[in-house]
C-alpha cells in the first residue's frame, strides 16, 4: 500500500506539512549558526556551510543504494545503476572520494570535532532511515533517496549548530 501511495505525484497535506517543517528548521538552524559565526569570520562560513550541507548530504543516498534493494518497478526506475543492479562498492567508494575535498575544507576551516559530529549525525540518520525502510518497504525507491538526502542535510546543519553553540561537546 505504501508503494502505491508513493507513486501518486500529488502532494498531500502531510507532505506539505513535512516540507514546510523541514524548510523552517533549515532556516532556523542556518540563522542560528550564521548569527554565531558571521561576527567572527564574515560571510565565508555561510558559503562553506551551504556547499558542505549539499555535498555531504548527497553521500548518504549512495549508502542506501548500496545497502537496500530497489522495490519499485525496475523498468521505470532511475535509482538503479545503469547496469540494472544495486550500487556496488566501486560506486560507493567513488562517491566517498568526491566528498573528501569538502571534508578537507571543513577540517581546515573547522576542526576534527566538527567533522566527527557531522559524521555521527549523518551515520545515525542514514542507519535509522535504512532500518525503517527495510522494515516498512523492504527496500528503497527514488522518493526514499530524496528523503534521505533532505534528512541528512538537516543532520549536517544540526551538527554544525551543536558545534557552534557548544564547541566543547
Regions found by a protein language model. Give the residues of each.
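Aspartate-rich (DDxxD/NDxxD/DxxxD) Mg2+/diphosphate-binding motifs
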Residues: 1-15
Amino acid at each position: 500500500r505504501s508503494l502505491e501511495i508513493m507513486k501518486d505525484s500529488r502532494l498531500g497535506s502531510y507532505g506539505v506539512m513535512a516540507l514546510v517543517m523541514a524548510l523552517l528548521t533549515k532556516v532556523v538552524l542556518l540563522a542560528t549558526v550564521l548569527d554565531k559565526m558571521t561576527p567572527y569570520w564574515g560571510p565565508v562560513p555561510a558559503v562553506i556551510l551551504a556547499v558542505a550541507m549539499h555535498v555531504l548530504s548527497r553521500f548518504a543516498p549512495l549508502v542506501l543504494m548500496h545497502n537496500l534493494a530497489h522495490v519499485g518497478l525496475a523498468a521505470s526506475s532511475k535509482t538503479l545503476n545503469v547496469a540494472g543492479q544495486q550500487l556496488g562498492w566501486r560506486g560507493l567508494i567513488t562517491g566517498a572520494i568526491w566528498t573528501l575535498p569538502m571534508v578537507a575544507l571543513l577540517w581546515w576551516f573547522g576542526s576534527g570535532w566538527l567533522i566527527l559530529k557531522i559524521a555521527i549525525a549523518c551515520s545515525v540518520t542514514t542507519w535509522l532511515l535504512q532500518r525503517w525502510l527495510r522494515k516498512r518497504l523492504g527496500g528503497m525507491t527514488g522518493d526514499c533517496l530524496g528523503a534521505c538526502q533532505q534528512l541528512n542535510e538537516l543532520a549536517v546543519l544540526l551538527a554544525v549548530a551543536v558545534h557552534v553553540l557548544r564547541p566543547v561537546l
